[in-house]
Regions:
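Short S/T/G/P-rich N-terminal loop/turn motif that feeds into the first structured element of a domain
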Residues: 10-222
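Bacterial Sec-dependent N-terminal signal peptides
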Residues: 1-13
Length: 222
């Protein structure tokens, strides 16, 4: 999970996510369909993205994510056409083998640069015993590792509806591509002391799964 926008009231920033399996060879058609429907959209906040799953534990091939602040989700009223979302889904169904799971949640912290500039994202699904303690430890390690991370974005948030068994929260880390992500992991090894402190103070956390996604099409609020 990750955001294509940043807002000061992070607790009010939300996402809604729908997984699906695309028909073979239909990825470009899906991206073009999204461009046709959302390329010139004026969103109240947030936006919409189409993403492809890469490495990891997810069984689906792609997903759609709708972002927005509570009370400001979707297109501006004057930019809205009747049954627009339904029409988009109807056309999208021609390129999809099956729809999968869905979930929704919130962003609790976002640091770094633009996710559009770092579209290769690794997402860690978490089970937290003490979310408050984890956020404190997370915020600290983010600051401690800022020098080597540079402008690459990192976010922390919750699953409030769905998300999976034994999963409550998530962390997302942006990179430019696969090689950049692996290089960042190697650089993180120099923070052995800091990560040991994070582990001791995070309130108890496990990582049931992790995976990567690649942004195929992004239509943020402008």
């Amino acid at each position: 999970m990750f955001a294509i926008w940043v807002n000061s009231s992070l607790a009010q920033n939300t996402f809604q996510l729908w997984n699906f399996n695309a028909k073979p060879g239909m990825e470009d058609a899906i991206s073009q369909l999204a461009e046709n429907h959302w390329g010139n959209a004026k969103f109240k906040s947030g936006g919409i993205q189409v993403e492809r799953y890469g490495h990891g534990d997810e069984p689906w091939s792609h997903r759609i994510i709708l972002f927005g602040e509570v009370g400001k989700i979707g297109r501006e009223e004057e930019d809205t056409k009747e049954f627009e979302w339904e029409l988009f889904i109807q056309k999208l169904n021609h390129f999809i083998e099956e729809w999968g799971s869905s979930c929704a949640g919130r962003f609790m912290s976002i640091e770094g640069g633009s996710w559009v500039d770092f579209p290769y994202v690794q997402i860690y699904n978490l089970k937290l015993n003490d979310p408050t303690a984890f956020k404190s430890a997370h915020d600290k390690i983010v600051k401690q590792t800022a020098k080597t991370r540079g402008e690459r974005p990192i976010a922390f948030g919750s699953y409030d509806i769905g998300g999976g068994e034994n999963i409550s929260h998530w962390v997302a880390v942006g990179s430019s591509d696969f090689s950049d992500r692996i290089s960042q992991m190697a650089l993180n090894e120099q923070y052995e002391k800091e990560w040991a402190e994070w582990s001791e103070n995070n309130g108890g956390a496990s990582i049931p799964s992790n995976y990567t996604i690649q942004v195929l099409a992004a239509f943020p609020n402008k």
